[in-house]
């Protein structure tokens, strides 16, 4: 039987329904907490889903590894509804968990020019479709401190490319190096950032 709640997660308003076929067809299962391996629940993959409450992170591989996808309230009929803006398209979603710290109204993030919180810094409290257009000097971010909420950072302007989900309740909110942004992080190139909505 699947281990559906491996992480200690406070009770919250989270609900996601997953389907093994596109357009909400086939086998379905509802979750109110994390799932480390959808195959242990009798699915070979997730092809569509509905986020009914809360915000979630979906992962390309089991055990919360690989490319990340932010999943906010709404319907995702085919796989490309959550993967279309990524640098490479992935038809796989094998694990997921709720984003406990998503707090759109109170979100606060500080980005730094270099690793280990060194160099020029900039405080963010809003969504930025292009960091450079808003005054950030280059297309790279060395490190970040999430002081409140949860954020999704994108490789390219316009919320495109690889997604890196940063949370105030993971790593103590401190991401001192780009390798801490996720198991799939390839570069410290960040050109757009937005708050995750609950």
UniProtKB/Swiss-Prot annotation:
| Cross-referenced Gene3D superfamilies | Crystallins (2.60.20.10)
Q: Where is this region: N-terminal arm?
A: 1-13
Q: Does the keyword Nucleotide-binding apply?
A: no
Q: Where is the Beta/gamma crystallin 'Greek key' domain?
A: 14-53, 54-100, 107-148, 149-197
What's noted about post-translational modification?
The N-terminus is blocked.
Q: Which Pfam families match?
A: Crystall
Any single GO BP term: lens development in camera-type eye
SMART domains assigned = XTALbg
Which keywords does this Swiss-Prot/TrEMBL entry list? Eye lens protein, Repeat
Keyword Cell division in the entry? The reply is no
A single GO molecular-function term is: structural constituent of eye lens
Annotated spans, Connecting peptide: 101-106
Biological role: Crystallins are the dominant structural components of the vertebrate eye lens.
Tell what the record comments on domains: Has a two-domain beta-structure, folded into four very similar Greek key motifs.
**Similarity comment:** Belongs to the beta/gamma-crystallin family.
Assembly and partners are described as: Homo/heterodimer, or complexes of higher-order. The structure of beta-crystallin oligomers seems to be stabilized through interactions between the N-terminal arms.
What's the protein called, per UniProt? Beta-crystallin A1-1
Q: Which organism is it from?
A: Aquarana catesbeiana (American bullfrog)
Q: What lineage is this protein's organism placed in?
A: Eukaryota, Metazoa, Chordata, Craniata, Vertebrata
